Amino acid sequence: MAKVDKIRKAVLFGDSDANIAFRDLCSLLISLGFSERIKGGHHIFSHRSVDEIINLQPKGNKAKPYQVKQVRNIITRYRLGVNDE
């Protein structure tokens, strides 16, 4: 769980959006309760309490910076990962 916490902090602080590994971002979403389905190169994440769908595609082995920002906005908007869920 320590690695997921480290990834979560990196995503939330937003200092290194271009340096987040794609697989780490996927792992973070799964640990927050998202379900993943894959269609071609698209990894599509949905969550029962989130109205939005997250659609991610890797850029090499990194996540695309604008998609990291989208994930950050959803985590903060829906207060995901907060102890009082």
Segments (PLM) and residue ranges:
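Basic nucleic-acid-binding interfaces
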Residues: A2-K39, R48-E85
